[in-house]
Structure formats: structure tokens, C-alpha cells
Amino acid sequence: MKVLRLRVAKTLAVIMVVCLGGFVCLGWIKDRDGPSIEDRPFNEALAPQVAQRGAYLVQVGNCAACHTARGGFPFAGGKGIDTSFGTVFTSNITSDKLTGIGAWSAADFWQAMHHGRSKDGRLLYPAFPYTEYTRITRDDTDAMFAYLLSVQPVQQANRPHALKFPYNTQAALAVWRALFFSPEQFEPLK
């Protein structure tokens, strides 16, 4: 009986140490990413001129390839991306205020592109290649955002991802980010 109690006590101690270590790591990961939003005003008056450049960047980035489901509306999302962990569904990036990015700010869009975080701070899956887009300049993300706001709004709810446990958790995603992602800042040559 004493052996069983000792074994249970040791197991609980190990679980507590692992949980404590996990919380410390998650705190470090959050701090490591730095400030989540570089806040600066978005000049709505310049939006039409900037949107022209954004249209080019969105085309070069081939955003429609992922954010348009077969037979669906452009940029309305819903396309499934199969991975060995399950299926990730792309989001609606039209200007719809309820289901798209129409209620986002330019800073929210920058946060998604640069830090891989949604408007609400949720970590995004790297099926969205923010690991590469982190190098895009703020001016370029503002231009892309201006263009996407000019796209016809499509009210289409985002499908939930169909990922296996534990890959469907923010904790697993945080661990992946700690190992493989660091936000970067691209500085073009002058």
C-alpha cells in the first residue's frame, strides 16, 4: 500500500512539474513574439491608390489560390488544406464585416501577416504561410489590406478546422511556434 501511495505521489509531482514548465514556456513564447500589433493610423483617403499596389501584391502572393474554394466566391475561404494532422480550412478574407476581415483594422491584418495571430489574438496555423509573410513590410501589408477591403464582401462563415488531438489545441501550436517560428522584419535595400 505504501509503495502505491509513493508511486501516486511521484506521478503527481511529475505532472505538476510538467504543467508548471508548460506554463512558463507558454509565457516565454508570448513574450518572445514581442508586441502583437504595430499600431499606426491607416489613411483611408489613400486607400484607392494603395489598393492598386495591394491588388498586385495579392496576385503575386497568390492569395486567391488558398482563399477561394472550388466553385466558390473569390477570397471567401472554405478551401480545405489536407495535412498529416487533419484538414485546415482557409478563412474568408473578403470585406464582409461579419465573416470576413471587414471589421479588422490594418493593424489586425499586420498582426496576422507578421505574427501569425488573428484579430482576437488566437494563434494561426502555419498552413497560412505567415512564417514567410512575416518578412513583408508594413507598407505592403497595408496595401494588401486596402485591396482586400475593396473586394466584394461575401457573407460566408469560416469552417472549423478538422484536426486531430493534440494538433487542434493552441498549446500544441504554441510549442510548434517556439521551435520553428520567429517574427522577422524585412528591411529593403535603399
Regions found by a protein language model. Give the residues of each.
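Alpha-helical membrane-targeting segments
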Residues: 24, 29-33, 159-187
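Electrostatic cytochrome c docking/interface patches
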Residues: 34-59, 173-190
